[in-house]
Amino acid sequence: MAYERYEPVIGLEVHVQLQTNAKIFSPDAAAFGAAPNTQVDPISLGHPGTLPVLNETVVKHALRLGVATHCSIADRSAFARKHYFYPDLPKGYQISQYDTPICYDGYLEVFPGEEEDASPSAPDSRRVGLTRIHMEEDAGKSVHASAGGTTRLDNNRCGVPLLEMVTEPDLRSPREASLFLQRLRQLVRYLGISDGNMEEGSLRCDANVSVRPQGREAFGTRTELKNMNSMRHVEQALDYEIARQIAAEERGESITQQTLLWDADAGTTRPMRSKEEAHDYRYLPDPDLVEVRIEDATVDEVRANLPELPRARRRRFVEEVGLPAYDAGVLTEERAVADYFEEALRHLYKRTKGGDTDAQAKAVSNFIMTEVMRVLNERDLSVSELGVGPERLAQLVFLRLQDKVSSNGAQEVFEAMLDAPDKSAGRIADERDLIQVTDRGAIAPVVEDVLNDNPDKVNTYLGGKDGLLGFFIGQVMQRFDGSPNPELVRSLLREKLDARRDTANVDE
């Protein structure tokens, strides 16, 4: 959506649910999908006399995300109680961080100008400032019945560890907001701290949005959008709210600061409540939790052990491996796929022992982006569940590079490899008679026989009917006990037919 007279101003509050074996302050399991109220204990339910104990893994995950997003790390960080009353908050308060977050003043870049359908006005990159990243516990879940007006509580989520990331109001379009979330999801997956699945609630986003006339510095009155559980819903909700605010401004109406719920079915928002300020939550220091102290050596260790991050890996795939930028972007979208590609390429290099490494990398990339990803999507698998490891994929790509199997033959071999984990690509190709004959000396006599057996068609071809070349290729293929390389057959036929044409011209 284009905005001619107004500029949207968007900031995000994103909750990242962490992958840990236990909750943030108790030893309960924190797995998704368990039966309601089966992952609770007195600590997460806030029973009297219980004391929380901070899960060290949560701190490590927070540091990994903070360092990866260029944040400053607080050497001292404390927890606070955020008070509000809601049925799915058993304690009557949420343990969070208020004025001393563990990470602050960072940034994450998005690249709107690299989108295939980017508008000419889209910036190549936008640095989105991060105000803070802090640790907190999740609340429970209210399940509202569609009939009867009853609400049931599932407290499994109480105490599940979260990182809340608050951005600066640096985003200028719904698309940029969606790109930011995609980049963040990719990052937390690379870091191994969250699966980033919005549909399961592992990545949740609220948006603060306002509009202002183009060129004005002061911000307009903002509203907060909630209940956006997919990237598509984020864009749709922001598009709707921006259009609503612009229409109100055009009518001379004031914008009310409030919280709005996105209704995806209706494609509209509805008011939830007036927007709270910090004082509404009565933040108080938590007396049961000691201060978190982070030493410089700890931060240095985290920085040294970070994996290669997506943007750097993509750049290396282009500059050092020799892939096109598009391929590099697709392969680095998920860390597991990028790892699979690199391992397969390493095994291929062992087999080729040199040659055109750019072409070899492209061959592996092509097969992953077509056949491998097709199977992953069709069977809803992760690459680790594929059944064809990187070494076996390298066997198949090597056969293809040597022209031992055709393109269609390689697809057939790959399908068979999925169900035959103990068989090599070469063995499957041999068992299915898919190995191509590539010996010119073996193919040339058959080509000569076909031409000698069809003199009338040869004369017709020489007279200008080039379409008969396909007939000759088919005849050669039929006479082989096996599968000759069709491109080699085509090349030999043209050589011999051209030779006969030259001879005929000389005789004339």
From Swiss-Prot:
UniProt keyword ATP-binding present = yes
What's the top EC group for this one? ligase
Offer an example of a GO molecular function term for this protein.
Answer: glutaminyl-tRNA synthase (glutamine-hydrolyzing) activity
Q: Please name the GO terms of the biological process aspect recorded for this protein, alphabetically.
A: glutaminyl-tRNAGln biosynthesis via transamidation; translation
Q: What does this protein do?
A: Allows the formation of correctly charged Asn-tRNA(Asn) or Gln-tRNA(Gln) through the transamidation of misacylated Asp-tRNA(Asn) or Glu-tRNA(Gln) in organisms which lack either or both of asparaginyl-tRNA or glutaminyl-tRNA synthetases. The reaction takes place in the presence of glutamine and ATP through an activated phospho-Asp-tRNA(Asn) or phospho-Glu-tRNA(Gln).
Q: Which family does it belong to?
A: Belongs to the GatB/GatE family. GatB subfamily.
Catalyses which reaction(s): L-glutamyl-tRNA(Gln) + L-glutamine + ATP + H2O = L-glutaminyl-tRNA(Gln) + L-glutamate + ADP + phosphate + H(+); L-aspartyl-tRNA(Asn) + L-glutamine + ATP + H2O = L-asparaginyl-tRNA(Asn) + L-glutamate + ADP + phosphate + 2 H(+)
Which spans of this chain does the record mark as coiled coil? none
Q: Which SUPFAM superfamilies match?
A: GatB/YqeY motif, Glutamine synthetase/guanido kinase
Subunit info here reads: Heterotrimer of A, B and C subunits.
One Pfam family name is GatB_N
Entry EC no(s):
6.3.5.-
Q: Any keyword Acyltransferase?
A: no
Q: Which UniProt keywords apply?
A: ATP-binding, Ligase, Nucleotide-binding, Protein biosynthesis
> Which InterPro entries does the UniProt entry name for this protein?
Asn/Gln-tRNA_amidoTrfase_suB/E (IPR017959), Asn/Gln-tRNA_Trfase_suB/E_cat (IPR006075), Asn/Gln_amidotransferase (IPR018027), Asn/Gln_tRNA_amidoTrase-B-like (IPR003789), GatB (IPR004413), GatB_C_1 (IPR042114), GatB_Yqey_C_2 (IPR023168), Gln_synth/guanido_kin_cat_dom (IPR014746)
Q: Which named protein is this?
A: Aspartyl/glutamyl-tRNA(Asn/Gln) amidotransferase subunit B
